[in-house]
Structure formats: structure tokens, C-alpha cells
């Protein structure tokens, strides 16, 4: 079982993601900061539309202090914002509309 941290404040989206991830044998932790993470957390999923989590400073800090693969999702992806977040350490950015549908296959691929 692998550990995944969800940096998601939207209750509905968090519940959907948590259920899907639990179904593919992932251990899910809802986190508010880097200090809430399990010791061996491999993947972080970030709501990039959230004011607290969806900024270069937070992503950069998370990247600097952990060795997690960081996956983000946001409503509207622009090249400028995507480039900044990727430079800060976000490995992949998905559209919000497809994150629930695609996250199980993305996580399975990463977990190989």
C-alpha cells in the first residue's frame, strides 16, 4: 500500500478522490501542510485552484522538503501558470474536469 497526500479543501472532490484511491489500494492522508505527511509519502495531489495550496511558494516548499511526485489539478490551465508550477516542482497538471476520471490510471502508472 502506497501513501498519497491530498492537499484538497473541497469536501466533495476530496471524497471522490479518496474513494477512488482507496479502491486501488492507496493509503490516503488529507494534509494541510508538509508537517501532516506520513513518513513514506510518495505522491501528493494538489488542488491548484485553492488559495493556500495553488501557488508557486507552496508547491516549491513541498518539492524542496519531500521527495513526493506532485500532481496538481486546476479548472483553467494556462501555459504561463503551468510553466511556473512545473518549475516549482509540480510534475503533472490535469484539468479539474478530468482528474476524478483519470487519477486511478495515472496513479497506477506512477506506482509501477
Locations of regions flagged by a protein language model:
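Alpha4 helix (beta4-alpha4-beta5 surface) of REC/receiver domains from two-component response regulators
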Residues: 77-91
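Conserved phosphotransfer microenvironments
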Residues: 45-62
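Short, charged N-terminal beta->alpha structural module
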Residues: 1-27
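Receiver (REC) domain switch/output surface
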Residues: 103-112
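Output/docking surface of receiver
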Residues: 89-101
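A short, hydrophobic beta-strand element within the central beta-sheet of small alpha/beta folds
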Residues: 68-77
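Structural motif
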Residues: 6-11, 46-50, 74-75
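Acidic, metal-coordinating helix/loop segments flanking the phosphotransfer/catalytic sites
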Residues: 31-43
Amino acid at each position: 500500500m502506497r501513501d498519497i497526500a491530498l492537499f484538497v479543501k473541497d469536501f466533495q472532490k476530496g471524497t471522490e478522490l479518496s474513494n477512488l484511491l482507496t479502491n486501488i489500494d492507496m493509503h490516503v492522508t488529507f494534509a494541510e501542510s508538509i508537517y501532516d505527511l506520513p513518513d513514506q509519502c510518495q505522491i501528493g495531489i494538489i488542488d491548484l485552484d485553492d488559495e493556500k495550496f495553488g501557488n508557486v511558494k507552496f508547491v516549491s516548499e513541498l518539492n524542496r522538503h519531500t521527495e513526493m511526485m506532485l500532481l496538481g489539478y486546476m479548472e483553467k490551465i494556462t501555459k504561463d501558470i503551468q510553466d511556473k508550477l512545473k518549475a516549482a516542482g509540480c510534475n503533472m497538471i490535469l484539468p479539474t474536469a478530468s482528474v476524478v476520471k483519470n487519477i486511478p490510471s495515472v496513479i497506477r502508472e506512477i506506482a509501477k
